[in-house]
Design a protein with these regions (language model features):
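N-terminal Rossmann-like NAD(P)+-binding domain of SDR-like oxidoreductases, especially those catalyzing
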Residues: 1-176
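Short capping/connector residues at structural and topological boundaries
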Residues: 39, 84, 125-126, 134, ...
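Phosphate/oxyanion-binding loops and surfaces in catalytic or ligand/nucleic-acid-binding neighborhoods
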Residues: 40, 158, 173-177, 199-207, ...
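Short-chain dehydrogenase/reductase
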Residues: 90, 138-146, 183-195, 225-226
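Catalytic core of nucleotidyl cyclases, primarily class III adenylyl/guanylyl cyclases
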Residues: 179-181
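C-terminal substrate-binding subdomain of Rossmann-fold SDR/epimerase-dehydratase oxidoreductases
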Residues: 193-274
Length: 278
């Protein structure tokens, strides 16, 4: 909730009239972002510094607030790190989900929006991919996302009166809120290109390096589907509204959040530079 994607989701939810409760252990985020969310929206939210694996803490929060729905964003997310420390990723990402689902059941909270990833598709044979494509994650991070998707599908099938879920498969979030008050500012080494671009732009880095020049693309650099983080945030609002609609039957529905169009890293850097310095 206090991270890059979560803070933008908070803005969208508050502006839509939702009361927001954020649970974040701040391992790779800052409570300052939530102060800025309140500054942007003119509204306050409830914040608890806690880990989603702490069942007692979650029970206390659910007992304090009348929770109607959960957006689950918590988890480790670096592909390379997941390959180096797979057990840490399986323990953290799966355990947090198990505890959260148990507490939701205890307090009869039915609606669940899950922050999944396009990594569940592995290396698809063709592009763009749609939600009917086979899933085949190729790294521990992606496998944790796929496992959680399958767990949710099993739970909805077994107890449709107790759980409905939307699985949002992100492609590559980029950008920031138009105010400039919140954006992607990782405390650790960035996991993607865009923080390097912005850090170079403001002088944190002397130069920008784009790795890879032999891909089968127009300019030889990798191609990715970038989606603006505010569009991604609005996707969560739409998922929540859809789940809370009285017309919605119990479900476990996967939805891709992307543009369906790839852009090479070199072209992406060029566009970013033009927008910042034109």
């Amino acid at each position: 909730g206090a991270g890059y994607i979560g803070s933008h989701i908070c803005v969208v939810l508050l502006e839509a009239g939702f009361e927001v409760v954020v649970v974040d252990n701040l391992s790779n985020s800052s409570a300052i972002a939530l102060d800025r969310v309140s500054q942007i929206t003119g509204k306050k939210l409830a914040f608890y510094k806690a880990d989603c694996r702490d069942k007692t803490a979650l029970q206390g929060i659910f007992n304090t607030h009348p929770i109607d729905a959960v957006i689950h964003l918590a988890g480790l997310k670096a592909v390379g790190e997941s390959c180096a420390f797979p057990l840490m990723y399986y323990q953290n990402n799966l355990d947090a989900t198990f505890v959260l689902l148990e507490v939701m059941q205890q307090f009869s909270v039915k609606n669940f929006v899950f922050s999944s990833s396009a990594t569940v598709y592995g290396d698809p044979a063709s592009m763009p991919v749609n939600e009917t494509f086979p899933t085949s994650a190729t790294n521990p991070y992606g496998r944790t996302k796929l496992m959680i998707e399958e767990i949710l599908a099993d739970m909805v099938k077994a107890t449709p009166d107790q759980l409905s879920a939307v699985l949002l498969r992100y492609f590559n979030p980029a950008g920031a809120h138009e105010s400039g008050l919140i954006g992607e500012d990782p405390s650790a080494i960035p996991n993607n290109l865009m923080p390097y671009v912005t850090q170079t732009a403001i002088g944190k880095r002397e130069c920008l390096s784009v790795f890879g020049g032999d891909y089968d693309t127009v300019d030889g650099t990798g191609v990715r589907d970038y989606i603006h983080v505010m569009d991604l945030a609005r996707g969560h609002l739409e998922a929540l509204n859809w789940l809370e609609s009285e017309a919605t039957a119990p479900c476990c529905k996967a939805v891709n959040l992307g543009t369906g169009q790839g852009r090479s890293e070199e072209r992406r850097v060029g566009k970013e530079c033009r927008s910042r310095w034109s």
